[in-house]
Structure formats: C-alpha cells, structure tokens
Amino acid sequence: MNQGRIIVITGSPGTGKTTIASIVAKESNMDKSVHMHTDDFFHYLSKGAIPPHLPESNEQNLVVIEAFLEAAKRYARGGYDVIVDGIVGPWFLEPWRALVREDYEVHYIVLRASKEETMKRAVERSKLDRKTNVELVETMWEQFCNLRIYESNVIETTTY
C-alpha cells in the first residue's frame, strides 16, 4: 500500500480553503482521499473549551493540533491523500516539519485573496459578533501577508 500525501491548504478566513480543499480531495490522483477540517477538532471539545483565538488557549490548541496530526498521519499511512483544511500559519509549522522528518510527504499551500475580498467573504458568515470577527479576520489576513520564504507557496484567490 502506498502512503498518502498530507496537503495543508491554509490562509485567512474567506480565501477559499474549504472550497479548494474539497476539490483537491475529490480530484486526488490517489485511490482514496480525506478532507480534514482542523476546526472540527476544536468543535469536539465539550467541557472547558477556550476559544482558540484567545491567548490563554495555547495549551488547549497544542493538544487539539497533536490529535489532528495523529489522525492525519494514520490516514496517510492507510494510503489516503490527506487534504488539511484550516488555519495553519508559518508560526505553527514545526509540527508539520516534524512529519516530514518522519518521512511523510507534506505540502503547504497558502491561499490569499485581497483584503477587501477576504473581508467581504469572511465577515458575514461568522458566528462571532461582527466587531470581534472583523478584528480577527483582519489580524489573520495580515498574518498571511509577507510570508518570506513561504511566498512561493501562495495561490491568489481574489477572483475565484
């Protein structure tokens, strides 16, 4: 059995992650694929959950990401192309680099739309209050700008 790839599709909210990840999973050249939403792993938390954007959530977020990584590895070992759909900034790539050192094939793709388009797409669909959502989306959009060595991983999605 061939080991599957792990393809991380990331970017700020409103850049098309879920749409693109779904297409990539369905069009994979592997016999099997899985579309994994990182957000789902945060929704599994029932008691004592801390909103992941708050600074005090760091320990919780590490546990959630570790659980997610283990699931992704297991699918890949099972021969699935693993399409990761979530916010994985360069500031949090070390766990993914560790997978490469474990001989997993990992790809990192950043989707980016203009700030105006990103805000238009993301702000209205959030479950957070508008002010908090605007602040979060603006912050995340800025975090995915000027990616230095990862700029070559960016795909522009403003017109898609």
Q: Which residues does each PLM region occupy?
A:
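Phosphate-binding P-loop
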Residues: 1-4
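Hydrophobic anchor at the beta1->P-loop junction of P-loop NTPases
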Residues: 9
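The conserved Walker
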Residues: 13
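Walker A/P-loop
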Residues: 18
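Conserved substrate/cofactor phosphate-moiety recognition/catalytic segment
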Residues: 22-67
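Glycine-rich phosphate-binding loop used to anchor ATP phosphates in small-molecule kinases
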Residues: 59-103
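Conserved phosphate-donor/acceptor-positioning beta-strand/loop module used by diverse small-molecule
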Residues: 102-122
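Small-molecule kinase domains that catalyze NTP-dependent phosphoryl transfer to phosphate-bearing small molecules
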Residues: 124-160
